Amino acid sequence: MIVFLVFKHLFSLRLITMFFLLHFIVLINVKDFALTQGSMITPSCQKGYFPCGNLTKCLPRAFHCDGKDDCGNGADEENCGDTSGWATIFGTVHGNANSVALTQECFLKQYPQCCDCKETELECVNGDLKSVPMISNNVTLLSLKKNKIHSLPDKVFIKYTKLKKIFLQHNCIRHISRKAFFGLCNLQILYLNHNCITTLRPGIFKDLHQLTWLILDDNPITRISQRLFTGLNSLFFLSMVNNYLEALPKQMCAQMPQLNWVDLEGNRIKYLTNSTFLSCDSLTVLFLPRNQIGFVPEKTFSSLKNLGELDLSSNTITELSPHLFKDLKLLQKLNLSSNPLMYLHKNQFESLKQLQSLDLERIEIPNINTRMFQPMKNLSHIYFKNFRYCSYAPHVRICMPLTDGISSFEDLLANNILRIFVWVIAFITCFGNLFVIGMRSFIKAENTTHAMSIKILCCADCLMGVYLFFVGIFDIKYRGQYQKYALLWMESVQCRLMGFLAMLSTEVSVLLLTYLTLEKFLVIVFPFSNIRPGKRQTSVILICIWMAGFLIAVIPFWNKDYFGNFYGKNGVCFPLYYDQTEDIGSKGYSLGIFLGVNLLAFLIIVFSYITMFCSIQKTALQTTEVRNCFGREVAVANRFFFIVFSDAICWIPVFVVKILSLFRVEIPDTMTSWIVIFFLPVNSALNPILYTLTTNFFKDKLKQLLHKHQRKSIFKIKKKSLSTSIVWIEDSSSLKLGVLNKITLGDSIMKPVS
């Protein structure tokens, strides 16, 4: 007895020792794990920068996922794909569904000759079968794809109780009896997609207790009831893509407690209710894109505590409740793209702490701000309609789009060609206009009022060159780190002043060209009229044009709530809008300027020059010097053509883009950059050539100046040679000097006569 007690005591002591030893080991392991976790803490980076894995180095967003190893350890090129949500898991499961290697041996004794058999799996694809064939009852997989089976009668599979998978795609099945799947208690996967099914009777799946996958895609099914899914206690995945459903059952998951994945893409569902997903506690993936859902009640998703991915894209949702996503604490991926949403609440995504991917493509967000996206600390991918929106989510590693056609994450001007052109056109514009101003000031013109108008036009065009120079300068300033300063830049005073300068130059130039055209029109078409503005009237008109241009450019500054950031919609600060993302005020104003004032001015210029050419041609036919008149006609036609052509190059692209935007046609982003940098300044660069350098008056005056300069040079040379002769004669004889003076005097008198 004593021995037993001693043994029992020792055994208890050993158990206690082992318990403490195990506890100590666990503590060590936990400590080690904590240390490991602590050592993996990523370095804190400033806004817009992201860490290089476990290195202390941080890089701007532009250097991540750009195809180059900028970190040195490849961390900046890792995790670039948007793998959040459950799409990857589904692909893996779906892809490996039939991955088990089968032997070529067939274990079925009876099956049609047109079928292929491997072990207990039978494939009868494209066999022209009109009904389910007679086969051995030990079959586990039956594929009857692409046959001519149009109906499934009662108990058609009653003998095949071991069936686990049935594939009935592409048969144009129209009718399925209520007891067609009777007895299939082991069936796990059922494919009925790409058929002609219009209705499914309640209870049709009541014996399919083990069914996990049900695929009903591409069938013209118009209605489903809650009782349709009776018996589907194990259903995991339900797909009804591209059906004709207009409504969902009152409680979608009442008969499917294990339902994990629902795909209802491409139906005609018009509404959801608070009870639609009330019993869908296990749901992790919900796809509802390409439907006609106009409104989602606030508590629609309140019971979906485990939801990991939600897709509501391409619907007609115009407004979201501020607390719609409040209960989706585990949501990883949310797609709201291609909805006509006009407003997002500032706390719309406040509860989505685990969200990793947010898709807001083709959505206008007029009230966008950085606070809207700050709560989503785990957000790694975000998709916007506008590139400039990326500035409001600097903490997100991957932001799309990468450019707006003008700027990129790295540079204000994303295209190397644009960088070169902006300097070339700026130089040509400034130099050409300053040269004309100088020459016009130096050369005295008979028509001083016209010369004054041309000089004022050159001043306006020169402002466009100054604007382009500033674009080039700020491009250099922000080279390689533009996205870091993009938001500050577009909201800065400098950007707004640049936009104001460009708009002032553009509108004053347009109004001046219209005035000069009308002035010329009156002279040529009505040569005997007395409608001729004098110097004072011309000065008043020019002052009014500058005041009108100034007002057009400055009005957007008066009411920011109405116009928004009118000049800060893109990196080059020019208000050339072409999409639906602008404020109502700025949209109406820009349309009024570009399709109102500028289009009207362009049409007046084109009409005037056509009328002038016809008038000149008519006058020429009445003269006798046909040959000379023909030459003059060609010259005038060429000149008028290039004037109209330069206006067309400048403004037609703008008009086309604005008109297309009215019809909601998507315009390529790159088009904006070419219009702003290349097409729009064409007039400013060519006006000096067209209105001064190629005119006959300027050519004649230039020839006179050159001739006068040549005469002065010749006179200086002769005078120099004369002085040499006089010095030599003085050394020789005073008599010769007098004779030479007479000869020289005679030469000088005779020269003008000759």
UniProtKB/Swiss-Prot annotation:
Annotated GO CC locations: plasma membrane
Q: How does it sit in the membrane?
A: Multi-pass membrane protein
- Transmembrane domains' residue ranges: 417-437, 456-476, 496-518, 538-558, 593-613, 640-660, 671-691
State which residues carry a glycan (glycosylated): 54, 138, 274, 335, 378
Q: Which one GO biological process term can you cite for this protein?
A: negative regulation of apoptotic process
- Swiss-Prot/TrEMBL keywords: Cell membrane, Disease variant, Disulfide bond, G-protein coupled receptor, Glycoprotein, Leucine-rich repeat, Membrane, Receptor, Repeat, Transducer, Transmembrane, Transmembrane helix
| Segments forming domain LDL-receptor class A | 44-81
Q: In which tissues is it expressed?
A: Expressed mainly in the brain, kidney, muscle, testis, thyroid, uterus, peripheral blood cells and bone marrow.
Could you say which disease the record links this protein to? Cryptorchidism: One of the most frequent congenital abnormalities in humans, involving 2-5% of male births. Cryptorchidism is associated with increased risk of infertility and testicular cancer.
Task: Name the protein family.
Answer: Belongs to the G-protein coupled receptor 1 family.
* Functional note: Receptor for relaxin. The activity of this receptor is mediated by G proteins leading to stimulation of adenylate cyclase and an increase of cAMP. May also be a receptor for Leydig insulin-like peptide (INSL3).
The name under which this protein is listed is Relaxin receptor 2
